[in-house]
Amino acid sequence: MRRVLLSVASIVFVSAVGSAQQFTYYFPQIAVGGGWTTTIFVSNATAGATGTATIIFTKSDGTPFKSNWLDEKGNDLTKGGNAIAVQLASGESRKFTSVGDASLTTGFATVFANSSAVLSNAMFTQFDGNGNVIAEAGVPMAIPLLKQALFVDTTNGIRTGVAIANPNVVSLPVQFQLLNDTGQVIASTTVQFGASQQMAFFLDQLFPNVPAMVGRLQFSATNPMTSVALRFNPPGIPFTTLSPLALAN
């Protein structure tokens, strides 16, 4: 089940961070192989101006995520590397799909764009042994947050999964607090999060002795992170994504 969580990605909150020349977005979860593919759509909503985007893929352990990605015409854009660079005319949209012909590998993606109007979404697809689609989830790109929360629901056998990416070049101590439906903190812990790395877990792995509940998991660090929650119905398929909430520091 943990491999399923590691295979689906990322945040459901859209925004941008950048200077006058560059805007940076993230997909905090990317899955390639083992019955999974990731598709990234990019569009230039700028009126009358060319948009550019560079997508850098990083593995969960912080090393370059080298894989093959095909465009909508079947051209291999990465050729075993870990970057896609694209120019888009005004109104143009592109599609990039990972080639899932190896064992499962996961990580996250960083998108550098020349405009806040160059926007993107990701779609994560799971296949059975015969190549049939059995589940999909789509999420938009996101910016990191210093303090955030994810809704939790573990009633009726449902499992809540969490995936977090640390896009910073420094290791972070992350403080987790689990709040019940009345807002009371019922469990807490601190986890060290490596630089440029990613972690994924089910709530019952982080807090194994907590009974079935509805509430929220909130967490914070000294540098911002990106996250997504995944709600898995028994026996783990189908699933859906849950958006993070930005909290006041």
How would you label these PLM feature ranges?
Residues 1-4:
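Positively charged n-region of N-terminal signal peptides that target proteins for export
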Residues 7-15:
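Bacterial N-terminal signal peptides
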Residues 18-249:
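Gly/Pro-rich, tryptophan- and cysteine-flecked surface segments typical
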